Amino acid sequence: MLNLPRLLYPLYERRLLKELNGARQPGHVAIMCDGNRRWAREAGFVDLSHGHRVGAKKIGELVRWCDDVDVDLVTVYLLSTENLGRDEAELQLLYDIIGDVVAELSLPETNCRVRLVGHLDLLPKEFAERLRGTVCETVDHTGVAVNIAVGYGGRQEIVDAVRDLLTSARDEGKTLDEVIESVDAQAISTHLYTSGQPDPDLVIRTSGEQRLSGFMLWQSAYSEIWFTDTYWPAFRRIDFLRALRDYSQRSRRFGK
């Protein structure tokens, strides 16, 4: 029996690519990879960790999709500060999976420039050291830049940025009045985990949840947001292209 949707997907994909040809596209896409466990549960898996494993494989695909349409930077939200409150067995599984994802993205043939964004001191020391050691190998790569948000919380990032700003001012011998005078949005931005990078143009969240849950709380102030009911393990290239098409049709106002 013919699988009609599967036959139509390539045609729909070509149509989307045609619509995107010459259209305005985001330079930075941030994505919240949500719905792994729900996908596994609804797919009938007894071991819900299977959802995390399938979702992990999707990340490499996402990076290739970004490369295909000239998205320069992608931020992938993998582990929040709130997630660190899960039971130890699930956390250890997540650490192993995330470590493998970062290792795969850091391979020479993948050519990604990988950066960690998050409060890494909240992570187990061995896991954090593994991640740091792996991403160091990508410094000379020239492909898509990939931020891995791990141990990340939007409020925590702003707190860390302010602390870093104040520490720098103290080390420079500035007075309190000088510090107060120097604090503005740009000053805080230079101390964020993503310092030196553009804010996300487009934020995508899978799984049907319609909130950002503190993801890139500072940087997403003027981002376009795209929600989809699709769980992350089931997220397809046509879903990604639909998000880009929707973005290209919006009029960005940047708060004006």
Swiss-Prot record:
Co-factor(s): Mg(2+)
Binding residue positions for substrate: G35, N36, R37, R38, W39, H52, S80, T81, E82, R86, R205, R211, L212, S213
Pfam family, one: Prenyltransf
Cofactor details (free text): Binds 2 magnesium ions per subunit.
Enzyme Commission code: 2.5.1.-
Gene Ontology terms: biological process: polyprenol biosynthetic process
Keyword Cell membrane annotated: no
Classification via InterPro entries: UPP_synth-like (IPR001441), UPP_synth-like_CS (IPR018520), UPP_synth-like_sf (IPR036424)
Enzyme class: transferase
Keywords attached to this entry: Magnesium, Metal-binding, Transferase
Active-site feature positions: D34, N83
One GO cellular component, as annotated: plasma membrane
Protein name (Swiss-Prot/TrEMBL): Isoprenyl transferase 1
Originating species: Corynebacterium efficiens (strain DSM 44549 / YS-314 / AJ 12310 / JCM 11189 / NBRC 100395)
Organism ancestry: Bacteria, Bacillati, Actinomycetota, Actinomycetes, Mycobacteriales
Gene name in the database record: uppS1
